[in-house]
């Protein structure tokens, strides 16, 4: 009887409290998503959203295994070919990549279902995406980026101006709150499909 040895290698994650590891063995690769902070959001809801996308015929990583007590889930591995990497390759068909991404976003926004069972069997209801939530999301730029790259002297003035502009833009949007919002839809998370 031969045992299957697996190798875990940390891979670049996103701006969350999740850590990602590629699990390699001689059978297949998978991704381990590990989170000790905000476990509900970073494991349960993450897997539920993927399940909702799959149910609506949108390619998303399937859940292979979960161990909530040990702070991880194991999901399908789509490889390393992100749209970001492909856009930066010489000779890539950038127009086609953008068109496919926009078509995918349009398909996602047509999802009307707002409830899905998580892997613990409980219903998860998508939150309403209102003006306040949009403001908080837009402010992430200040929370994650400006304080890292702008001097403290300029930071407060810049953040006040950015907040003012965000509020102005939101006040002119006229949100209907009936669209699925995929909060991680960006070129570093979109894979070649």
Protein language model annotation of sequence segments:
Residues 16, 46, 162-165:
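Amphipathic coiled-coil/heptad-repeat helices and related helical stalk/stem segments
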């Amino acid at each position: 009887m031969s045992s299957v040895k697996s190798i875990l290698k940390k891979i670049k994650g996103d701006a969350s409290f999740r850590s990602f590891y590629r699990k390699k063995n001689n059978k297949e690769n998978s991704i381990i998503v590990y989170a000790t902070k905000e476990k509900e959001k970073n494991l349960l809801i993450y897997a539920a959203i993927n399940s909702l996308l799959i149910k609506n015929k949108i390619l998303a990583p399937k859940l292979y295994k979960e161990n909530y007590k040990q702070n991880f889930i194991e999901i399908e591995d789509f490889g390393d070919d992100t749209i970001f990497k492909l856009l930066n390759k010489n000779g890539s068909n950038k127009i086609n990549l953008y068109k496919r991404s926009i078509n995918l976003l349009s398909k996602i926004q047509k999802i009307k279902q707002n409830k899905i069972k998580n892997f613990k069997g409980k219903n998860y209801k998508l939150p309403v995406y209102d003006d306040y939530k949009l403001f908080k999301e837009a402010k992430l730029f200040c929370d994650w980026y400006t304080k890292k790259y702008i001097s403290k002297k300029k930071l407060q003035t810049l953040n006040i101006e950015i907040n003012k502009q965000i509020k102005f833009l939101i006040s002119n949007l006229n949100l209907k709150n009936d669209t699925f919002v995929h909060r991680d839809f960006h070129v570093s998370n979109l894979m070649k499909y």
